[in-house]
């Protein structure tokens, strides 16, 4: 199955690109939010896995990413991402219908966007959210001088393009994944002082408003993540568990992109098993009870 390409108008009328992998009679639809510097096309293999399970997949390219318009790695306000996602959800519902069960899946920056979206739109009719290594704390060491400079540039030159310093080798143990990432013309390594500052501010907001996220959550935590702190993912899951059903899967020794690791088949199986419990035979029926673990 080949994904189709389309565009729509995001917040502020920016042109945003998305891909969709529709199955003939879907049992549910999954909305995917990608990470910093990448794009929705990198989730094609996952979309194929979902298609075989009867799930349609829609993957947005965030503004400043992939085929979407906008300066690479820049956003004036993080809330733009959040509002873009709501407009995208409405677009997806217009295509598949509002009665189809909806699942969210967000990776890294996309996970943070999804958390803040679900906190700001608590009434969204979704069955649950899969958070893959959500950006809840940066593991990469940032020199103190660079952090101070970014704080100044946040106001002085907010759109100044800077290098993220991301090493593709720490994304996955699979050399083919790493090489494909390096060769991908739609991948970028840019971040601006404004986006850097907005990310840190929104991480604080995610923890402060954890009780506002009321959906069932599957948290995927790679223990050897060198980009996002696993301990803060665990802390967020523990805080969230007070209000919402949360299942945590920790993957020993895996790097940041658990969906692209050498053992991805077992990760995908975990996701599909969790989704199955969220979408009973009759979409109008209440989801099956799930124990937190």
What is each of the regions a protein language model found here?
Residues 27, 35-38:
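Active-site glycine-rich loops that stabilize anionic/oxyanionic intermediates
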Residues 103, 107-192:
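Alpha/beta-hydrolase-fold enzymes
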Residues 47-71:
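Conserved alpha/beta-hydrolase
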Residues 1-23:
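N-terminal cap/lid segment of alpha/beta-hydrolase-fold proteins
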Residues 213, 219-221, 225:
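Short beta-strand/loop motif that positions the catalytic acidic residue
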Residues 245-293:
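Catalytic active-site module of serine/aspartate enzymes centered on a nucleophile-bearing elbow/loop
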Residues 37-40, 66-96, 100:
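Catalytic nucleophile-loop/oxyanion-hole region of alpha/beta-hydrolase
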Residues 215, 229-239:
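Short alpha-helix in the alpha/beta-hydrolase fold that links the catalytic acid
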